[in-house]
Amino acid sequence: LLRSDQLTELTMKVALVGLEHHMRFDLTGYPRMGDQWEIGVMSRIVSIADCYDAMTSRRTYETDRLIPHRVMLHMLGRSGKNFDPVLMRLFVCLMGLYPVGSLVRLTRGDLAMVVATDPTDLVRPVVRLLRTAQEQIIPPSELQLVNLNDRGFWPEAELPIREALDPEVFGLDLAPYLL
């Protein structure tokens, strides 16, 4: 496929990622390369990103998609088997258990969208309020941010997020709130 005089270090790394990114951390998956094979770090990173993207995106061949929070929990549960546990922990710290753009219901009933994550406290992101507990809609032009890590706002013993939700169920387009 490639002539040896055209192979650079970069093209070899790219080809290796193409070969390895469906291999699991425990060397199951495909292609089967044997028990002594060492999956490259770039392939392990792409494997995590590819899985997250596939599970959270609507595909032509797959009508269902999962909300990001459920995907993160699923992938964490496969850490050490499907995914490199160190890289998986880093991915969760970067993305958050409730990734930016996630729709959540707070324990007091408000609907909010995650706008920033805190790698030191994965269950207390910064959110933008969208609807109050009394179902009052907060328009995109009004910016109401709440740092769920603010212990004065949320008592430490209380988890601020009751559940992650699918915006389509509520007929919400979150894009205007991201701008």
Segments predicted by a language model, with ranges:
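Histidine- and acidic-residue-rich, metal-dependent catalytic cores
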Residues: 1-179
